[in-house]
Swiss-Prot record:
SUPFAM superfamilies: Ribosomal protein L22 (SSF54843)
Assembly behavior: Part of the 50S ribosomal subunit.
One BP annotation, GO: translation
An example molecular function term from Gene Ontology annotations: rRNA binding
Protein name: Large ribosomal subunit protein uL22
InterPro entries, A to Z: Ribosomal_uL22, Ribosomal_uL22_bac/chlpt-type, Ribosomal_uL22_bac/org-type, Ribosomal_uL22_CS, Ribosomal_uL22_sf
Keywords (A to Z) from UniProt: Ribonucleoprotein, Ribosomal protein, RNA-binding, rRNA-binding
HAMAP family named among the record's database cross-references: Ribosomal_uL22_B
Organism: Prochlorococcus marinus (strain SARG / CCMP1375 / SS120)
Record-level GO cellular component terms: cytosolic large ribosomal subunit
């Protein structure tokens, strides 16, 4: 395991299913901060908005709390876990009601400095 510090951010109780959020997180995991922002901007999914907010928060934590350079950060971990479901009811014919589950999820993103920048500094 590497000894590089990680900066994390969490978005909790985000409306949307965890599986749909994971579909986007799988695309940006391991990429640089700049590449991830560009990808998120042009993806046609609704979950890119909350993911962008959590990613920017993780980078702000890295910059302010750990003094890292945002241009050298890569996304180390990105995960989405299921949150509680909000239960709603839709009225139907003859006095019946159908249950509707509005799913939520928790988004976690951790960023770390890329190994390329640290190895080039060490070799100089």
């Amino acid at each position: 395991m590497s000894d590089l510090p990680l900066a994390q951010a969490h978005g909790r109780f985000i409306r949307g299913s965890a599986s749909k959020v994971r579909r986007v997180l799988d695309q940006i995991r391991g990429r640089t901060y700049r590449d991830a922002l560009i990808m998120l901007e042009f993806m046609p999914y609704r979950s890119t908005g909350p993911i962008t907010k959590v990613l920017r928060s993780a980078v702000a934590n890295a910059e302010n709390n750990l003094g890292m350079d945002p241009s050298s950060l890569i996304i180390k971990t990105a995960s989405a876990d299921m949150g509680p479901s909000m239960k709603r009811y839709r009225p139907r014919a003859q006095g019946r009601a159908f249950a509707i589950k509005k799913q939520t999820c928790h988004i976690s993103i951790a960023v770390a400095p890329s190994n390329q920048s640290t190895t080039t500094e060490a070799s100089d």
